[in-house]
Amino acid sequence: MAKGILGTKLGMTQIFNEAGEVVPVTVVAVEGNVVLQLKTVDTDGYEAVQLGFGDIKESRQNKPSKGHAAKANATPKRFIKEVRTSVEGYEIGQEIKADIFAAGELVDVTGTSKGKGFQGAIKRHGQSRGPMAHGSRYHRRPGSMGPVAPNRVFKGKLLPGQMGGERKTIQNLEVVKVDVERGLLLVKGAIPGARKSNVIIKSAVKGN
């Protein structure tokens, strides 16, 4: 059965495994997940568990958010997402902790990648630059726009533009360690987003 939890990326570090090898890990804080709503086939046409994470400060709360959270006896949450899974074993108001996952499990992590602003074709797409000798006037431009005949640039041409700031999912990352007391998950490798950004951790679609 698919599982999921919401969290905040704290940053990266490294730990040693049993073989004495260094393993790079990302630390994700997951303490404070609450089941706000259960979606069922009868009422919504599909099954899902709605999770809330991160409290909204009092001055930012509105009546709809207070009313929705009150049904779960919780405070309004800043980050609310659904996990498509069976609702069996879940109750409204239930707290989801880090031990929903175990060390060795594979997960998919979704987050918003770091925004890089407007970037050129070399940085954005990894293209090669032109000759840098003084005889050349072609250095970091995007290259040919295509053939003359269509009188237009084809869709998909790799050009300068906004880089980063997109929703990205990294698949099949291993859960290296689960710290229930401190509400932390240590995931092998890097995950999308800047420090203190919100992420969604779900059971791997392809791996498990």
Swiss-Prot record:
GO molecular function: rRNA binding; structural constituent of ribosome
Source organism per UniProt: Exiguobacterium sp. (strain ATCC BAA-1283 / AT1b)
Keywords, ordered alphabetically: Ribonucleoprotein, Ribosomal protein, RNA-binding, rRNA-binding
Record-linked HAMAP family: Ribosomal_uL3_B
Protein name stated in the entry: Large ribosomal subunit protein uL3
GO biological process annotation, one example: translation
Region listing for Disordered, in residue ranges: 117-149
PROSITE patterns named in the record: RIBOSOMAL_L3
Described function: One of the primary rRNA binding proteins, it binds directly near the 3'-end of the 23S rRNA, where it nucleates assembly of the 50S subunit.
One matching Pfam family: Ribosomal_L3
Lineage: Bacteria, Bacillati, Bacillota, Bacilli, Bacillales
InterPro entries hit by this protein: Ribosomal_uL3, Ribosomal_uL3_bac/org-type, Ribosomal_uL3_CS, Transl_B-barrel_sf
Superkingdom as given in the UniProt entry: Bacteria
Complex and partners: Part of the 50S ribosomal subunit. Forms a cluster with proteins L14 and L19.
Family: Belongs to the universal ribosomal protein uL3 family.
Segments traversing the membrane: none
Assigned GO CC terms: cytosolic large ribosomal subunit
Signal peptide: none
